[in-house]
Amino acid sequence: KVLELYSRPDNPLFIPETIGHGPLTRFFFAALGRGAIGYAPFGMDDTAIQRGRDGRPLVADEKYGDTALNYRLLEPMAREIARLNHAGKVQTAVQLAVDSTSGPGSTFDRVHYLTDQTLHFEGWDADIAFGRFNRLARITRQPEGPDGRILIAELGKGEFLLAGYHCRVLFRPTAEKKERPWQYLQVEEGRYVDGEFRASRILNGDQTDWGLVFATPTVLRVQLYTR
């Protein structure tokens, strides 16, 4: 709600200070979805020894790993994200709470497909469910706190760039093609290098048919078509 209040056409959104550890770091994605031009986690330059609840000193990954996850995922394509965001092509979603009551859901029941949020693009909707998933359903063991996040950028007609963690995404056609059969033309996992997307592997049907699962921080380039 705070991001909504401060993100206006006459007021570019800038987050001057925010928590840099724990599940709240997922709201970096929410800020990007509101067109933020800056985001500054507090205490990243603090070199003092910090101790955990058991009294032992925390290592760097325990102190900064949550913020590092965001930057490691998006830094290689920061310029591309900024350009796409300026053009109004970027949308994001973050997990607001861990839902322990909904059950695993069924990928075979597309009428009641497990969905927490839906993002709307030209000709396509992206249904998003947060948490840990296997190929077919949400698994029993979930993170203690909500940490799911997804960024989807529209690259062209039926072509999208996705970056996310602990979520599942299923596209479906809308408008006049709502009832048409559709398919993934290609789903590539990779990263940006010097402004170009370089695929490290192409996902097969078993890895895409029931939704795109982001079990680890992952970047995908997706091409869709309708018959």
Segments predicted by a language model, with ranges:
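Flexible loop/turn segments at secondary-structure boundaries
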Residues: 2, 21-24, 47-50, 169-170
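Glycoside hydrolase catalytic-domain groove-lining segments
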Residues: 1-28
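Aromatic-residue detector
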Residues: 6, 27, 31, 50, ...
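C-terminal beta-sandwich/jelly-roll accessory domains of carbohydrate-active enzymes
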Residues: 119-227
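Aromatic- and carboxylate-lined catalytic core of secreted/periplasmic carbohydrate-active enzymes
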Residues: 29-167
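A generic structural motif
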Residues: 14-22, 39-48, 184-197, 201-202
